[in-house]
Amino acid sequence: MKADIHPAYHTIKVVMTDGTEYETRSTWGSEGAVMNLEIDPKSHPAWTGGNQQLMDRGGRVSKFNKRFGGLGL
């Protein structure tokens, strides 16, 4: 097996949309980094039955609707 080809694992903190936090090991970020989730199993329509609206934090949905809303598909 080749040496030094595998990514380093380290501990990060994950913050869910409701504010709950937990620590896990990941290759994402660096040691002690914080990952803030915009969508998680508690807020995703696939797991909540589709009744909850997605939050448009990045403005991507509104930008898409503004650009292509008049097509009337």
From Swiss-Prot:
Molecular-function annotations in GO: rRNA binding; structural constituent of ribosome
SUPFAM superfamilies noted in UniProt: L28p-like
Keyword Ribonucleoprotein: yes
Pfam families found in the cross-reference section: Ribosomal_L31 (PF01197)
Keywords recorded for this protein, A-Z: Ribonucleoprotein, Ribosomal protein, RNA-binding, rRNA-binding
GO (cellular component) term, any one: ribosome
GO BP, sorted A to Z: translation
Highest rank taxon of the organism: Bacteria
Record text on subunit structure and interactions: Part of the 50S ribosomal subunit.
Free-text function comment from the UniProt entry: Binds the 23S rRNA.
PANTHER family with a match to the protein in the record: 50S RIBOSOMAL PROTEIN L31, CHLOROPLASTIC, LARGE RIBOSOMAL SUBUNIT PROTEIN BL31A
Family per record: Belongs to the bacterial ribosomal protein bL31 family. Type A subfamily.
Name under which the protein is recorded: Large ribosomal subunit protein bL31
Source organism (scientific name): Agrobacterium fabrum (strain C58 / ATCC 33970)
